[in-house]
């Protein structure tokens, strides 16, 4: 089992797909990493040699932020926006959509389940 950036890659999958199990690596960046490391994307994870795994690990370490470091950087960016009090930071703090979406009807993912408000008695 190949272990890269603290993640065990699935043995049966192609390395091109297996790398996407690491947070911060998608299909495009996976192919870019494999090209730099000189590894065939169609190779199964179980068939990789230790040298190939080491090459892939080196390329990832020198060029990308992945897993915990990436999560930490994203959290710090959001925290910074909240501290400076900009519009995006306020939206993050209130748990509302940040990128200009309308909130009159939808936005349930960001707002959470509906909370029904009781009507006033006449």
From Swiss-Prot:
Pfam families: Ribosomal_S13. Keywords: Ribonucleoprotein, Ribosomal protein, RNA-binding, rRNA-binding, tRNA-binding. One of its GO terms (biological process) is translation. One of its GO terms (molecular function) is structural constituent of ribosome. One of its GO terms (cellular component) is small ribosomal subunit. The keyword tRNA-binding applies. Residues 95-122 are annotated as: Disordered. SUPFAM superfamilies: S13-like H2TH domain. PANTHER family: 30S RIBOSOMAL PROTEIN S13/40S RIBOSOMAL PROTEIN S18 (PTHR10871), SMALL RIBOSOMAL SUBUNIT PROTEIN US13M (PTHR10871:SF1). Part of the 30S ribosomal subunit. Forms a loose heterodimer with protein S19. Forms two bridges to the 50S subunit in the 70S ribosome. Belongs to the universal ribosomal protein uS13 family. Located at the top of the head of the 30S subunit, it contacts several helices of the 16S rRNA. In the 70S ribosome it contacts the 23S rRNA (bridge B1a) and protein L5 of the 50S subunit (bridge B1b), connecting the 2 subunits; these bridges are implicated in subunit movement. Contacts the tRNAs in the A and P-sites. HAMAP family: Ribosomal_uS13. This is Small ribosomal subunit protein uS13. It comes from Lachnoclostridium phytofermentans (strain ATCC 700394 / DSM 18823 / ISDg).
